[in-house]
Amino acid sequence: MDHLTKEQIAEFREAFNLFDKDGDGTITSKELGTVMGSLGQSPTEAELKKMVEEVDADGSGSIEFEEFLGLLARKLRDTGAEDDIREAFRVFDKDQNGFITPDELRHVMANLGDPLSDDELADMLHEADSDGDGQINYNEFLKVMMAKRRQNMMEGHGSGGHRSSNSHKKSGCCGPNSSCTIL
């Protein structure tokens, strides 16, 4: 969370305090429900508890400010990553028709110095092409790239880590000179 500015932390503190109705330094599922209700949402108690559990790193049953900060920092990181992924998609989608065809994928990977065999191309398409139409649309590309990014972060490579092994490049990373090396 050291990448958040003092201004962002101050804004997030204000937001946290709006949720923390009783001022005890934690957000309970009940407090979360109150705020969501004021925003026109009506989640069930079970849904509220699940939301709290997803953020509650220490298992206390409520959300402390540090946990709240962690959630918001992840959301900010994911937003920036999606912009980079969108740009990478544009690079792959040579004719800008909204789809990456097998030929476009093969062409870009070859230009990145990583030509694909027929089997490797088939594997990449199989992994990404969830609707089975033989090409990759933006949502399919985004899903695969965000999953790769999360996997890399969990493996300790952070958002700037890039491994140069061919197996990694062929499973989602776009190469050292590409805008998607942050993945």
UniProtKB/Swiss-Prot annotation:
Location relative to the cell: Membrane
Statement: the UniProt record of this protein carries the keyword Transmembrane helix: no
Region (Disordered), start-end ranges: 154-183
Alphabetical list of PROSITE patterns matching this protein: EF_HAND_1, EF_HAND_2
Cellular compartments per GO CC: cytoplasm; membrane
Positions that bind Ca(2+) 2: D56, D58, S60, S62, E67
GO molecular function, one term: calcium ion binding
Annotated Ca(2+) 4 binding sites: D129, D131, D133, Q135, E140
Lipid addition sites, S-farnesyl cysteine: C180
Alphabetized InterPro entries for the sequence: CALM/Myosin/TropC-like, EF-hand-dom_pair, EF_Hand_1_Ca_BS, EF_hand_dom
Binding site for Ca(2+) 1: D20, D22, D24, T26, E31
Positions carrying Cysteine methyl ester: C180
Record's keyword terms, sorted: Calcium, Lipoprotein, Membrane, Metal-binding, Methylation, Palmitate, Prenylation, Repeat
Record-linked SUPFAM superfamilies: EF-hand
Role of this protein: Potential calcium sensor.
Family statement drawn from the similarity comment of this UniProt entry: Belongs to the calmodulin family.
Name listed for the protein in its UniProt record: Putative calmodulin-like protein 2
